[in-house]
């Protein structure tokens, strides 16, 4: 273990072409302190050699190419915006690292496949092509062709810009426009989903088979045939429950028709109220657990 740590520390310094400080600590993921020039690597037993090479190469890429203004821009934009900034900047620094050191290409590609197999991006069972553009861009640049990502002509223009971004100023410009594009994209997808929901609702397409009683946490109606007769008073009512004034009152309280939020496609639910890169967020969370 010690020999491996020493060799990886030496590798990091050689790649960075400067005497950066390299520390192994009980942290969950690798990180680079842009201001203090300190690379922190985790003490992990379940990572593969390729994963370690990826983490080292990735953070050294930030050491070489990411300016201190990155931190300021991320803070100013907020947490959701910072996921966009991270996706675009990651694509730039990893491309530049692989150009500098072609030997990193293979282990980085293998490592991202291994992370995907462990579902670090949170895409298992998801239709990746139904996700927001920012997430498709993230998967495209990190996983390559195996992700099977599709783009239309307008989206492809953003992909090409990310591919060619050479400076952090270009990254900021692309990120700001991409963020605005995805906000509009999410609004449009939600509107389309809502219109489809209303159409299905009018056609009576929602039934027990689609949603059932699970919406309400189970069937609240009781099988009175199985109850003890002593549980009822002389009028045949259950003292423990309030009487329903009518059958309509019962029906109105327990409709099986879902709300739009319940019927919303999973690919939209994951974004919540604010557009963000859920794949970047999931990856960071997975590294920290």
Enumerate the predicted regions with their spans:
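Short, functionally important secondary-structure microenvironments
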Residues: 1-289
